[in-house]
């Protein structure tokens, strides 16, 4: 399957069959938070300072059933949110989800990422989680999104990593082989996949990895289908990831989980090796981490930015003393009178 239109149609069919993510619809705001979806927290992470405005425009690119969209609306009370997706079925769920939780500052569009230029204006925050790696041409997709990012704006991206999903790729191919001409029948694919897991020995590597890492979420057919019978998936390594980033023309700000990219937990027992690693570039150190700890790197989650994007320097005492502190909205999941809970 190489024709882009055929691929896009197959992806839309999957999500029309199994709307994803399958989180339940609530008649109230969603619980907790994801700080990456909170403008104040995300901007502070990227720049080291609070943004000057909160009345921003947000694009949820590939919104699925609206789980991320709903959070983006509720976590950013002054923002206007636009959400797009290629699947009409998931958009219907997303619309109902936001209506039921009173997330009313959102507009939905049945649109491919490739066609983001059809949207009016620019956006201060673009969120695209789990979407680019399902496009026939992810570089074209990220370029389309980059054209909609306003100067000084930030983009939050999540894509799959190759090394940590090795067993998944094997199972995907096994299911496709056994489906034969029925490949593309996603309900049959889920049934075949579950039968394979049930038939394999308990000590089988694919079974063990599924049980250790994925089985809880994969109890739901929607999650199982998204993982094992998806018609289009491109997984990345550090090298190919930065090729994707370069195609965007945007600045790489950093991974949103920076502690996961530290070498100390891996090589801390040997200071000499850590010293050798200091001579490596950032990208080489990232590559070293995923080579030494491949099971932990199942995806990459990071921020990109468009200049001019300020970077606060708090090394000067005078600057620090002149700063006006403000509580991070994602310090706790609820309002609290205390700064730290012990």
Model-derived regions: residue spans:
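A short glycine-rich, Lys/Arg-flanked "PGG" loop and its adjoining helix->strand segment in the class I
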Residues: 140-151
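Conserved alpha-helix/loop element of class I SAM-dependent methyltransferases that forms part
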Residues: 17, 27-56, 71
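Rossmann-like AdoMet/SAM-dependent catalytic core
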Residues: 212-342
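Conserved SAM-binding loop of SAM-dependent methyltransferases across substrates and taxa
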Residues: 65-77
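Conserved SAM-binding strand-loop segment of SAM-dependent methyltransferases
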Residues: 102-114
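A short acidic, Gly/Pro-enriched loop at the edge of an enzyme's catalytic core
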Residues: 117-125
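Conserved class I S-adenosyl-L-methionine
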Residues: 154-206
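Conserved SAM/SAH-binding beta-strand->alpha-helix loop
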Residues: 87
């Amino acid at each position: 399957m190489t024709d882009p239109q055929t691929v896009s149609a197959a992806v839309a069919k999957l999500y029309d069959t199994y709307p994803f993510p399958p989180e339940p619809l609530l008649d109230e705001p969603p619980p907790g938070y994801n700080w990456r979806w909170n403008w104040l927290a995300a901007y502070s992470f990227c720049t080291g300072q609070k943004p000057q405005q909160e009345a921003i425009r947000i694009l949820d690119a590939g919104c699925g059933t609206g789980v991320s969209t709903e959070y983006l609306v509720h976590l950013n009370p002054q923002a206007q949110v636009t959400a797009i997706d290629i699947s009409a079925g998931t958009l219907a769920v997303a619309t109902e989800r936001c209506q039921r939780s009173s997330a009313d500052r959102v507009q939905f569009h049945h649109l491919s990422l490739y066609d983001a230029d059809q949207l009016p204006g620019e956006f201060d925050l673009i969120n695209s989680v789990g979407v680019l790696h399902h496009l026939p041409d992810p570089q074209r997709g990220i370029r389309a999104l980059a054209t909609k990012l306003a100067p000084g704006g930030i983009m939050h991206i999540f894509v799959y990593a190759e090394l940590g999903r090795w067993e998944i790729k094997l199972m995907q191919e096994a299911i496709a082989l056994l489906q034969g001409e029925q490949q593309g029948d996603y309900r049959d694919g889920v049934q075949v996949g579950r039968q394979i897991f049930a038939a394999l020995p308990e000590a089988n590597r694919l079974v063990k990895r599924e049980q250790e890492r994925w089985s809880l979420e994969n109890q739901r057919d929607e999650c199982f289908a998204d993982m094992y019978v998806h018609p289009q998936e491109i997984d990345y390594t550090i090298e190919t990831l930065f090729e994707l980033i370069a195609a965007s023309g945007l600045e790489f700000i950093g991974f949103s989980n920076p502690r996961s990219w530290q070498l100390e937990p891996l090589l801390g027992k040997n200071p000499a090796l850590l010293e050798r690693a200091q001579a490596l570039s950032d990208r080489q150190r990232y590559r070293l981490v995923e080579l030494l700890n491949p099971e932990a790197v199942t995806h990459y989650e990071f921020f990109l930015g468009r200049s001019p994007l300020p970077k606060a320097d708090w090394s000067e005492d005078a600057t620090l003393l002149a700063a006006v502190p403000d509580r991070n909205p994602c310090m706790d999941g609820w309002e609290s009178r205390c700064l730290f809970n012990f």
